[in-house]
Design a protein with these regions (language model features):
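C-terminal ends and interior cores of transmembrane alpha-helices
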Residues: 91-114, 308-320
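Hydrophobic core of transmembrane alpha-helices in multi-pass small-molecule transporters
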Residues: 28, 110-134, 324-338
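Juxtamembrane intracellular "pre-TM" segments in multi-pass secondary transporters
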Residues: 2-17, 206-236, 423-428
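Cytoplasmic helix-loop-helix junction between adjacent transmembrane helices
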Residues: 124-163
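Conserved MFS/SLC helix-loop-helix module at the cytosolic interface between two early adjacent transmembrane helices
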Residues: 67-108
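Transmembrane alpha-helices of Major Facilitator/SLC transporters
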Residues: 66-68, 271-294
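Short amphipathic helix-loop junctions that connect adjacent transmembrane helices
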Residues: 39-53, 251-271
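C-terminal transmembrane helical hairpin of 12-TM major facilitator-type secondary transporters
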Residues: 298-343
Length: 428
């Protein structure tokens, strides 16, 4: 939600509102592009005769680069400004989607052996992880620059809800159109959409605030080490752990449904698309309705989210039919909506104005860490020890995060900062 008028901010609320709406649309487009893969890849892999572990490798390849590069892009946005980095990330995302579409077409048409097609898909996701990862930390820092401490958690919740909105549309669009037009044409359309967003950012996103820290040297290892700063460390640990839970559930859900309900690949696409859409709807409801109504501190949001993750994973352990599986996944997604807004808002509040880009990069990198570990690990557990094992491990991890949220003093301290009087905001 854009902040009210502040005489210290000459841009006024209307210009900020338009800027935030544009960022919302851009992140929603990238959310569509990312979430559709969780509906498309499991049935595509089975059509190509590729083992589940190779699907996990695609996610992990992208996630490793996302993990290491997000802090760098966040720091670069402090140096060169938010808008150029947002535009660059969107452009690279569009290009990576085009490459993925070509690889999928080559694999399905028989022009490339299945493992070569999977390798090309992994290369495309490498481009996204390394370069497309510039968008999220830069957009998050853009919003943090223009909101007070008291407003920031809610404002960042609205921004991250954009990605969740895309997560609703991605599986739904995939389920509706992939069977009709094919994987490659559908992904080309998504690439065009994201490319149009990059053009819109170049032409329409205002940025009057000069970059801070222009003399700071960008050392990738130093930016990554910023995660160990004692102000940020508890939020980074919580975020990485929660992203592992989320990445595990996203990776496994398609295979879990096909196993439990004895579905063929086409049915798996339809059923998983509906489940993913329902979960994303719960995430959006948490971020756009529940969080503004609660006006809770980051600590409370983190605790509530972790508690929901415990309940959701336990539900999946005993789910006996499609409705029960969807219900468990909805609980997991609702909890993630609360927790993600809590740890991103808390990390932003824990540091000063000149460190917002770096903090945004570090918290964004937790997604990369989660997806670097969880997909391969979850699918290994799935194949080796049974389909409920990933949910059992996630339930234990969520219980640990629940304790961290309520017991760590740094999380409590950052939550107290949100109660101070709003500070003047910088111009757009």
């Amino acid at each position: 939600m854009p902040p009210p008028y502040d005489p210290a901010n000459p841009s006024g609320p209307n210009e900020r509102r338009r800027a935030f709406r544009l960022l919302f649309l851009c992140l929603m487009a990238t959310g569509i592009g990312n979430s559709m893969l969780f509906a498309i890849l499991p049935p595509l892999a089975r059509d190509l005769g590729v083992a589940e572990a190779w699907v996990g490798a695609i996610y992990t390849t992208s996630a490793l680069l996302f993990l290491f590069m997000s802090p760098v892009w966040g720091a670069l946005s402090d140096r060169y400004g938010r808008r150029p980095l947002i535009m660059f990330g969107l452009s690279c995302f569009a290009l990576s989607t085009l490459i993925f579409a070509a690889a999928a077409w080559a694999g399905e048409s028989g022009l490339a052996p299945p493992l070569i097609a999977i390798f090309a898909m992994a290369v495309s996701r490498t481009l996204f992880g390394g370069l497309g990862s510039a968008t999220n930390p830069s957009a998050q820092a853009y919003v943090a620059d223009r909101t007070s401490p008291a407003e920031r958690t809610e404002a960042l919740a609205g921004l991250t809800a954009a990605f969740g909105m895309g997560a609703i549309l991605g599986p739904a669009l995939a389920a509706a159109f992939v069977e009709r037009i094919g994987v490659a044409p559908f992904m080309i359309a998504i690439a065009v959409l994201v490319g149009a967003c990059a053009v819109a950012v170049r032409l329409m996103l205002p940025e009057k605030t000069p970059p801070r820290q222009q003399a700071r040297p960008i050392n990738p290892l130093r930016q990554f080490a910023f995660a160990l700063d004692r102000r940020l460390a508890p939020f980074v640990i919580f975020g990485a752990g929660y992203w592992m839970i989320q990445a595990s559930s996203l990776t496994v859900i398609g295979f879990f449904l096909m196993n439990r309900l004895a579905l063929d690949p086409q049915q798996g696409l339809q059923f998983s698309g509906v489940a993913l859409m329902a979960g994303a709807g719960a995430l959006i409801f948490a971020q756009l309705v529940v969080i503004p109504a609660l006006k809770a501190s980051p600590r409370v949001l983190m605790g509530l989210g972790a508690g929901m993750a415990v309940l959701g994973n336990v539900e999946m352990l005993f789910a006996a039919n499609y409705a029960a599986i969807v219900f468990g996944y909805v609980m997991l997604s609702f909890g993630f909506g609360l927790a993600r807004s809590g740890f991103t808002g808390g990390a932003s509040l824990a540091v000063g104005p000149d460190e917002q880009g770096r903090a945004a990069g570090v918290t964004t990198a937790t997604a990369g860490l989660g997806f670097a570990i969880a997909p391969v690990g979850a699918l290994y557990l799935f194949q080796t020890f049974g389909d409920i094992t990933p949910y059992l491990v996630s339930a234990v991890l969520a219980a640990g995060l629940l304790a961290l949220a309520f017991l760590h003093p740094r999380i409590r301290k950052a939550s107290d900062i949100a109660k101070v009087t709003p500070e003047p905001r910088s111009p757009v």
